[in-house]
Amino acid sequence: MINFGVIGYGYWGPNVVRNLDSLEDAHVLAISDTSPSARARAHKAYPATRITDDATEVILSTDIDAVAIVTPVWTHFELAKAALENGKHVFVEKPFTSNTAQAEELINLAARNSLRIMVDHTFLFTAAVKKIKQLLHDGTLGKLYYYDSTRVNLGLFQHDVNVVWDLAPHDLSIIDHLIEQDPEEIVATGQTHLNGFEDVAFITLYFPDGVIAHVNVNWLSPVKVRTTLIGGAKKMLVWNDLEADEKVRIYDKGVQITSREGMYNLLVNYRSGDMWVPKLDQVEALRVELSYFVDCITQGQTPFNDGVAGLRVVRMLEAANRSLQQRGVAVPV
């Protein structure tokens, strides 16, 4: 049994507590939050659990094995560092840290103390992303050409980060997981309209072998859109995460150049075949992720979404921010 302390009971924290509480080999012993209303909600939902306003109390508790940090990114480093120094495994909400130096320090600290870090990249545990990764690995899609994502909605405006640091970690972690290569350069453009932070942004990532990824993130959209297009040499797919049933659609469509003899003799064959929808398991990704974290702790394994994976995403976020500040200058990663 792994005993958890959860720090942060705002928007995402209740989901973390609920899913940990549902696992047979995990138990939430303590919840901390600085907000009186959040603590009241936690006490009402879990009257037998210790509720406190002091995160340090949770971190220092000798009966707690692991800490879940579900707080704003600017708090992640200090909380995670204290937890690791006190022998606690750490599950931390995305993005991992505010900068790469902090991420590297936490990774080294965890390694010295033989502790596990897991960064909450929840989408990697969805049935859709698992299926897409399988389709790439087994060659169904062929050589990958592009990843093109739109992740937009009205709000929720953040007071401490821009839209890139709020929404892009989802796609950047997915891209990192699927492509399995570091981007060579990142170009980002965006604009600030309301609260001093960029609320609209467009990020382009250039990878080796001609692979390109594009991510559109936006807090000022009248509609919520969660759509990703992935194109390969053999097949293409559309992933609409807002679809209840047919989240992933695979299209047997493609283009083949059959002749390059002169500019006006280009022969292009367009292939248009069937569309099919793979069956996806209906599971809550966060529960799968937390169960995997518990297994990694008990079995001494390193999770694939560990601190190093979190560092790669933070490195991409930093590059995107630098490009934003220079109005789209290409930044090496």
Regions found by a protein language model. Give the residues of each.
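NAD(P)-dinucleotide binding in Rossmann-like oxidoreductases
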Residues: 191-193, 211-288
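Beta-loop-alpha module in the N-terminal Rossmann-like domain of NAD(P)-dependent dehydrogenases
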Residues: 16, 49-109
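Hydrophobic residues in well-ordered beta-strands that form the structural core
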Residues: 53, 92, 117-119, 148, ...
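Rossmann-like dinucleotide-binding domain that binds NAD(P)(H)
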Residues: 154-223, 229, 243, 308
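N-terminal Rossmann-like dinucleotide-binding module
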Residues: 1-46
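A contiguous active-site-proximal alpha/beta segment in oxidoreductase catalytic domains
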Residues: 74, 97-159
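C-terminal helix-rich "cap/oligomerization" subdomain common to oxidoreductases
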Residues: 66-71, 288, 292-333
